[in-house]
Amino acid sequence: MAGEIPDLVAQERTGTGKGAARQARRDGMVPGIVFGGDVDPLPINIPFNVLIKKLREGRFKSTLFNMKVEGHDDVRVICRDVQRHVVKDLPTHIDFMRLKRTTKINLFIAVEVEGEDVAPGLKKGGVLTLIRPEVELIVTAGDIPDHVTIDISEMEIGDNITISSVNLPEGAKPTIDRDFVIAQLSAPAGLVSSDDEEEEDGAEEAIEATEE
């Protein structure tokens, strides 16, 4: 579960528009905007190196931050969009939304797997496919989970895990009503091919017997 809310320090951007955004990038900043909460949008700049480090740490868009901007009250925010350079894939603009701790929000939460070392299906050569490495959940802003865990320790070949069998964090629920599959354990390709060949051979023998 989420622990202490990390700080994210930004600077207020005095200018607006493309010209001010370009100047911010030349100064080693990434321009952004903070919106929502019945308050006027606040243009900001975040140091490029700081933002890159945060992005590389992972789960940036599912992390609740305490944003600190000089001259403004601290506010809890969550990232809603990171625009990137089409060629370099580096951040060029970032959007944050203000939140209260009790605000409900839709977020994609990472799925982590446990029990791989003892899963009988894997020991028999089965292949685990994580169909959804992330699941979209409705969560409370003040209690955003780092991840959800699926336990495959008892999975056999042919089994799957659906969202209804996952212990979700308290207060969290899926955005989709249907019981969708998160992971499945399939037979290895070679075994599937062998089974298919055996079925075909059996069918041919049956046809030959009929013709005789």
From Swiss-Prot:
* Highest taxon listed in the record's lineage: Bacteria
RNA-binding in keyword set: yes
Question: What's a Pfam family this protein contains?
Answer: Ribosomal_L25p
What's any GO biological process attached to this entry?
A: translation
Q: Which GO terms describe its molecular function?
A: 5S rRNA binding; structural constituent of ribosome
What keywords does the record list, in alphabetical order? Ribonucleoprotein, Ribosomal protein, RNA-binding, rRNA-binding
Chain intervals with Acidic residues compositional bias: 194-212
Name the segments for region: Disordered: 1-24, 189-212
- Gene3D superfamilies assigned to the protein according to its UniProt record, in alphabetical order: Ribosomal protein L25, beta domain, Ribosomal Protein L25, Chain P
Quaternary assembly = Part of the 50S ribosomal subunit; part of the 5S rRNA/L5/L18/L25 subcomplex. Contacts the 5S rRNA. Binds to the 5S rRNA independently of L5 and L18.
Described purpose of this protein according to its UniProt entry? This is one of the proteins that binds to the 5S RNA in the ribosome where it forms part of the central protuberance.
State the name under which the record lists this protein.
Large ribosomal subunit protein bL25
In its UniProt entry, the species of origin is given as Roseobacter denitrificans (strain ATCC 33942 / OCh 114)
